[in-house]
Amino acid sequence: MKRLPLPLQPSTFLQVLRSARTLGLSLLEPVDYASRVINNKRRLPPVHLRREVGDLSSFESSGGEFMAYCKLLASVHPGERVLDIGCGCGLMALFFEDYLDTTGRYVGVDIQSRFVRWCRKHISSRSPNFKFIHLDLPSQRYNPRGNAKADFCIPEEDHTFDFIFAKSVFTHLLPKHVERYIAEISRLLSEDGRCLASIFLFTGGRTEVTGTQNHLSFEYGNDTCRYQSEHIPETAVAYSESYIRRILSHHNLVLQEPIRYGTWSGRANGLSFQDLMVITR
């Protein structure tokens, strides 16, 4: 009797799908490169890397939007020391490269090694005050073979950074990694430092995050965190606001008011899509 093939695990299926998409996008590389040259955008990462961090059509506009938040909400200055957690393929690094002066410093951290390699080759090579670190943290969605321990440390000295940025990082983390990143933010933030982070927050029960008015629905999980996908939770994660406040307080951090709630939950007057938090000591 012929054996039926075993079904693919969700994480394996995702890797196969990703590889196929990357192959397809790689066929567009010559056209994309020509377009970047013609439009004087050679600094942009290639199309297959840009697609990994979001919608191709909004890659640059998203960076511009969040650069404005960095200035307006967290008062970042050109001479400051900046840590970008989840730097991806260098979206915000490109904006900070234009903004920071020679006394400023930028460190980007990401769990995907191909992003870090590209940023080192194309950004650090021309801007020596820009450094990129690969943090091999396991993630079922983004780095399934990662082997960093749960008590990982970002290899930088205590109280090093004036500004820490975490765009769409907590939205893809499970609780143990959220708590560890917050501990690292507390360790690395200077006395007068600020952190700007985007997140999905809920204050009520299950109906708040599964309602029909929501642009995202978090059907799975518990009262602390809820997931959009049962099989690959890191696809999108929402957290109880009280839980986040408690973890911040435990690490001697303060969530500045007001939280700028986003439109993801159906709010018509949200500042951005995700909720925005400014964190200080």
At which residue positions do the language-model features occur?
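Short catalytic micro-motifs in class I SAM-dependent methyltransferases
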Residues: 168-169
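A conserved beta-strand element that flanks and buttresses the S-adenosyl-L-methionine
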Residues: 165
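A short glycine-rich, Lys/Arg-flanked "PGG" loop and its adjoining helix->strand segment in the class I
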Residues: 179-191
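Helix-capping/helix-break motifs at membrane-protein junctions
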Residues: 174-175
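Conserved beta-strand/loop positions that form the S-adenosyl-L-methionine
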Residues: 85
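Class I (Rossmann-like) S-adenosyl-L-methionine-dependent methyltransferase catalytic domain
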Residues: 3-73, 78, 89-96, 107-153, ...
